[in-house]
Amino acid sequence: LPVEGSEVLVIENLNVYYAKAHVLKNVTLRVSQGEFVSIIGPNGAGKTTLFRTISGLKDGHGRISFNGSPLPRDPAKIVQLGVIHCPEGRHLFPEMSVRDNLLMGAFRLKDFDPDAELEKIYQLFPILRERERQMARTLSGGEQQMVAIGRALMGRPELLLLDEPTLGLAPIVRKAIADALKQINDSGVTILLAEQNVPFALAHAHRVYLLETGVIVKEGTPEEFRADAHVQHVYLGGV
């Protein structure tokens, strides 16, 4: 459960530009320890840019702090702090096995038992145990996404950034990933999720932000979002 008053991530008045395009406009958000926060919004709203900026891959103007200190702008240092980004697109090593792809995520750990760490991932995604020796390129899209999430978890994140993890996946795979994310969050990992699939984004979140054309236009609980007429009409198909 979220720890009240214990903010892991604080972003204040963040502005990001691509050339002359103002992509993120005075974005302010907060994520508490143990919280599951979802950011919803249409394609092109700025969700990926926000995650790239948090991860140090894109420059921004504003304040980003992690556990009360300014977040460094060096991506390697950000990872060492425990902020792990699982980007859209999976980015696996196609000619490496599932096992070796997963182990690539443990590079920041000093002393660890590979088999013990892998077992945690296989408990979340049992199909990966069966696929352990297969090349990543032979996997289905859903299995590749499970490997990508598992690889991020191998770094023992304190804050896990997940960018569009269900894009193009079948409903049964989305359900498996949703269940895994709940277990991950229940184990104490703070999650910040960017997702176009709004029912998925609302399923296990504690709080939700709506980002449209680079602006945070709404913040609230999943229940408040489901009851909002604009959200219902635009993002939930009138449900």
Model-flagged regions — what are they?
Residues P2-V239:
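Glycine-rich phosphate-binding loops of nucleotide-dependent enzymes
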